[in-house]
Amino acid sequence: MSIKPLHDRIVVKPIEADEVSPGGIVIPDSAKEKSTKGEVIAVGAGKPLDNGNVRTPCVKVGEKVIYGQYAGSTYKAEGVEYKVLREDDILAIIG
């Protein structure tokens, strides 16, 4: 898949939650929470500022991030679900 996000948008592939709890209990799909972690797949050029400059994004392709549960838009391509987020929707970089 080839996708190029615009401005300060970032495409993230959600990382699925574990199917087994730390205590060994199998978690059914109906009880799983939506993932709030993902891997950055593509990054836009940056946010245009009022003075004409562009603020370069803080995240890079390949980094793992945490984002808000209801942030962004969902996009499905070739059977894979992606999230398209604004850079401000990303809460932290993992690792």
Swiss-Prot record:
Asked if the Swiss-Prot or TrEMBL record annotates the protein with the keyword Signal, the reply is no
Q: Which Pfam families match?
A: Cpn10 (PF00166)
Provide the GO biological process annotations.
chaperone cofactor-dependent protein refolding
- Keywords for the protein's UniProt record, in alphabetical order: Chaperone, Cytoplasm
Instruction: Tell me the first and last residues of the signal peptide.
Output: none
Q: Which Gene3D superfamilies match?
A: GroES chaperonin (2.30.33.40)
Q: What GO molecular functions are on record for this protein?
A: ATP binding; metal ion binding; protein folding chaperone; protein-folding chaperone binding; unfolded protein binding
Q: Which CDD domains does this entry report, sorted A to Z? A: cpn10
The record's subcellular location field reads:
Cytoplasm
Q: Name one GO cellular component term.
A: cytoplasm
Could you describe the subunit structure of this protein?
A: Heptamer of 7 subunits arranged in a ring. Interacts with the chaperonin GroEL.
HAMAP family the record matches: CH10
Matching entries from PANTHER family are given as: 10 KDA HEAT SHOCK PROTEIN, CO-CHAPERONIN GROES
User: What's the family?
Assistant: Belongs to the GroES chaperonin family.
Question: According to its UniProt entry, what is the function of this protein?
Answer: Together with the chaperonin GroEL, plays an essential role in assisting protein folding. The GroEL-GroES system forms a nano-cage that allows encapsulation of the non-native substrate proteins and provides a physical environment optimized to promote and accelerate protein folding. GroES binds to the apical surface of the GroEL ring, thereby capping the opening of the GroEL channel.
Protein name per the record: Co-chaperonin GroES
**Gene (name only):** groES
